[in-house]
Amino acid sequence: MSHYVGRLGRRSPAGSGRLRLHRKPRRVAMLSVHTSPLHQPGTGDAGGMNVYIVELAQRLAAQNVEVEIFTRATTGALPPTVELAPGVLVRHVDAGPYEGLAKEELPAQLCAFTHGVMQAWAGHRPGHYDLVHSHYWLSGHVGWLAAERWGVPLVHAMHTMAKVKNAALADDDTPEPAARVIGETQIVRAADRLIANTAEEAGELVRHYEADPDKVAVVHPGVNLDRFRPADGRAAARARLGLPQDALIPLFAGRIQPLKAPDVLLRAVAVLLDERPELRSRIVVPVVGGPSGSGLAKPEGLQKLAARLGIADVVRFRPPVGQEQLADWFRAASVLVMPSYSESFGLVAIEAQAAGTPVLAASVGGLPVAVRDGRTGFLVQGHDPAAYARVLGDFADTPDLPARMGAAAAAHAESFGWDTSAAATAEVYTAAMHDHRRYRVRGHYG
């Protein structure tokens, strides 16, 4: 069994010789209602899922599976279609006002979005799409209807789940609504296949949503190994970013929201400097990312927290950056810090490791898969700032630790290439198509 594809139940029996001749779909309709793959990760609702969709679609296209991505238009200036890469088309769907709609308000626009998807399909002959792959629960509801209308299988990826998030909320975070829980439960029942990032996420689908284990496939996300690599090293990256060569640099990179817990990093730095004030002159704490959500989600809230903690002089807030510059931030850091309350996988953890930087993370969700505790980084139980401060102190006392662990981290990340992930996803597609056809034939003949 592939390192990337695991089934909680038994594998589907092999298809007939005729089915094996069509192992992959020719064309897939991907749905991403609430965030466009063209948006900058780290801003608003754009994050790891955006990277996931872009990379997966491009690698599927390279493996002769065309992908059309449907997403909601957020400005009237957008063309109806954009070619993201050869074989990958982004289709913008008008659904509600272009600006001012929060993600929480989008369920009211799902009817309009579905109408736009159907309009785009209407110009094609039946069979134009072989499969629907929806991302996040909002897209899952559109995918459910589209797959039924087109007579094709539905593959769905949750990315995050309401019940899991609600069980691990930060103190100042807002619970996911009951309507989302109901919606996710309906999608789990309707989908032909569910893709989970890790075995733990697959288990959560079964425990929390009563998913059929035989429908769940585990496919680890990948990392762009051409972009995220050690390259010319930490010193060169620090020189490009204007960072001191001898500094301890714990980096936070991602959306600024309670779920990601950037405040835990700031509180940990405050604890460290209270205990060891001599480190103040040689620590820099970059926070790279934009606002998302509410409460401490806004950078101003974090800036005020840094001031209250007495560490404003060592914290540097930076807006979201493109993937190439993000790779440089990873290379420059002593350690990437991810104190998240919930992560289905944690793409930035693999990206940082691929760039040669160890990770200090909360032991939640998929992070124990992404990070090898004690070898490529450190995992902390819970969110006590003092626990993170102790590890940061170890990095301060062991100057060769970033390089030593970073080398192991880069080697570890090599096993997470997107080509392998895309090939595994194509296997899931093939299994879904096989079972869907078999079910339809059985239903037709009684």
From Swiss-Prot:
Pfam families, sorted: Glyco_trans_4_4 (PF13579), Glycos_transf_1 (PF00534)
Alphabetical list of SUPFAM superfamilies matching this protein: UDP-Glycosyltransferase/glycogen phosphorylase (SSF53756)
Residues that, per the record, bind 1D-myo-inositol 3-phosphate: H34, D45, A46, G47, G48, M49, N50, K103, Y136, T160, R180
Location of region: Disordered: 1-21
EC number: 2.4.1.250
Gene Ontology molecular function: acetylglucosaminyltransferase activity; D-inositol-3-phosphate glycosyltransferase activity; magnesium ion binding
Catalytic activity, reaction form: 1D-myo-inositol 3-phosphate + UDP-N-acetyl-alpha-D-glucosamine = 1D-myo-inositol 2-acetamido-2-deoxy-alpha-D-glucopyranoside 3-phosphate + UDP + H(+)
InterPro entries per UniProt: Glyco_trans_1 (IPR001296), Glyco_trans_4-like_N (IPR028098), Mycothiol_biosynthesis_MshA (IPR017814)
Residues binding UDP-N-acetyl-alpha-D-glucosamine: Q40, P41, G48, R255, K260, V321, E343, E351
Keywords: Glycosyltransferase, Magnesium, Metal-binding, Transferase
Chain positions recorded as Mg(2+) binding sites: F330, R331, A333, T357
Superkingdom of this protein's organism: Bacteria
Record function comment: Catalyzes the transfer of a N-acetyl-glucosamine moiety to 1D-myo-inositol 3-phosphate to produce 1D-myo-inositol 2-acetamido-2-deoxy-glucopyranoside 3-phosphate in the mycothiol biosynthesis pathway.
Subunit structure: Homodimer.
Similarity section: Belongs to the glycosyltransferase group 1 family. MshA subfamily.
NCBIfam families found in the cross-reference section: mycothiol_MshA
PANTHER family according to UniProt: D-INOSITOL 3-PHOSPHATE GLYCOSYLTRANSFERASE, GLYCOSYLTRANSFERASE
Protein's UniProt name: D-inositol 3-phosphate glycosyltransferase
Species of the source: Streptomyces scabiei (strain 87.22)
Classification of source organism: Bacteria, Bacillati, Actinomycetota, Actinomycetes, Kitasatosporales
